[in-house]
Amino acid sequence: MIEVENLSFSYGRRKSKVLEDFSMKLDKGSVYGLLGKNGTGKSTLLYLMAGLLRPQTGNVLYKGVDVKKRYPDTLQDMFLVPEEFALPNVSLKQYVKLNAPFYPNFSDELLNACLRDFDMNEDIHL
């Protein structure tokens, strides 16, 4: 479960807040959509929820733990794919070998099943 409590955030010295006293609760096992116009704070909220930004006020709790603390046990369950990102110049196999240890719940079997579903193999280059 993710709980957002009275979250307020603004970038730099901007007077207008991107989020102000925002609260919500997301239950485990549910699927949610985040809709809004460009520049209304959707990405900012996701970065706050992942602990990558710090709010001016309020808290984000993931399984009861404040995400600002960035505990490894908390981070191993979190995945955030930004809108734009750079992939390293390695094969998928190399990428998995380097990063899978950080995610104890990572499943080679599930990855291989997904690759088969899309007629791909782990030797593809990122």
Regions inferred by a protein language model and the residue ranges of each:
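A short, flexible loop at the N-terminus of ABC-type nucleotide-binding domains that lies
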Residues: 1-21, 28
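Conserved A-loop
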Residues: 10-14, 62, 103
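A position-specific signal in ABC ATPase nucleotide-binding domains
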Residues: 12, 53-55
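The feature captures the beta-strand-to-loop junction immediately N-terminal to the Walker
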Residues: 32-37
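Helix-to-loop junction immediately C-terminal to a conserved catalytic motif
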Residues: 50
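Conserved ABC transporter NBD signature motif
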Residues: 58-69, 73-74
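ABC-family P-loop ATPase nucleotide-binding domains
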Residues: 82-126
